[in-house]
Amino acid sequence: MAEAPAGRALFEIYDEGFDSPSWGGVETALWHLSRSLREAGTEAEFYRSSEGADLDALAARVERDRVDAVFPLVESDLFEGAAWRRLPALHARTVRVWHDVSRLSADLSAPPPCPVHARVPALPGAPVAEGCPARGAHPEGPMREVFLGEWPWTRCFPRRSVIPWAADHVPAKDLCDPSGPVVLQLGKIDTVDAERCLRRLTGAGVALRVVFATWSRRGREARELVRAHQGAGRRVEVLDAYDIRTDWERVFGGASLFLLPSVFHETYNFAAAEAVQLGVPVAALGEGGNLPRFASLTAPTPDALVDRLLAGGGAVAPRPRPAAGWRDVAARYAEVIREHPAAGAGPAVPAGAGEGRGGREEEHGG
């Protein structure tokens, strides 16, 4: 007789699934998290966004299949308005993973500081406070929250855990070559800034290997910019699309640096984490959410970052590889999945718990 699973989880995935060229951070996370959960005896299944649009049907499936926890995408209709009051049984089993900050910041910049919870975090059972900028995201609802890092804005949510993602889906290698090209990701800064960045780097004779944040309009515009900068003796290689599961060496092999200018509040960034795992140093903006934890070189603006690189600042060592991997992440998620929905919320998990490794924006992740 087959042994019963340790828990049952249901994850929302974009309609494109796992075979789309637009594969990004969310797909990377769900692919490796679900595999590690299954290996540890927790059942993990998926439903597509179009299927989740019918909240009543989703609630019926959760009840019928005895799902312990359902993980919608952060932009799900489950989190719109007062929907959580209409389907309390579903929301009691809902876990919101903050893979981006779109619920709190329309332009994906850092959410504003909270004057209410700056000193004292929100407490379980307390009514949502007047003046709390997270009010519209319903921190008072029965949903559990998983954050990928510890920031001031996470203190507004009483039922929270901090569980960063991992990067050991690529091997621990030392691929850096100080004389190699700079890998440049575009699509997360304004097009005019991307053009200036390209012009300065190619004008200085820097060899580039360019990848794009393909989910964004800026990323698509950057492709056209790069084509205009190819040729005429400029050393610009373009990788329009890649699958990091198999193409990690094609992307980062022999690179001297990974240059990732992003104005977004990155809750996690797989491209940066993967570069560190592969031994390539990262350069990023200093106010990029989780990005600075992976960066060996930071600056406040794209221009200042290019200044530092051209002044020789690119000769830096990569940050240490995170110790924890997907098995560790899955173990933490399994605890969340097994938590009884009706149980009272415990204290917030400390920022360091489960760490050691250390969107749709990468989501806003890679």
From Swiss-Prot:
One GO biological process term: neomycin biosynthetic process
Annotated transmembrane regions: none
Domain of life per record: Bacteria
Entry's Gene Ontology molecular function annotations: hexosyltransferase activity
Basic and acidic residues: compositionally biased ranges: 357-366
Pathway it works in: Antibiotic biosynthesis; neomycin biosynthesis
Biased composition (Low complexity): 342-352
Residue ranges, annotated region (Disordered): 342-366
Assigned keywords, A-Z: Antibiotic biosynthesis, Glycosyltransferase, Transferase
Catalytic activity reported: ribostamycin + UDP-N-acetyl-alpha-D-glucosamine = 2'''-acetyl-6'''-hydroxyneomycin C + UDP + H(+)
Cofactor: a divalent metal cation
The EC number(s) this enzyme carries: 2.4.1.285
Main function: Glycosyltransferase involved in the biosynthesis of neomycin by mediating glycosylation of ribostamycin with UDP-GlcNAc as a sugar donor to generate 2'''-acetyl-6'''-hydroxyneomycin C.
Family: Belongs to the glycosyltransferase group 1 family. Glycosyltransferase 4 subfamily.
Protein name: UDP-GlcNAc:ribostamycin N-acetylglucosaminyltransferase
Gene field: neoK
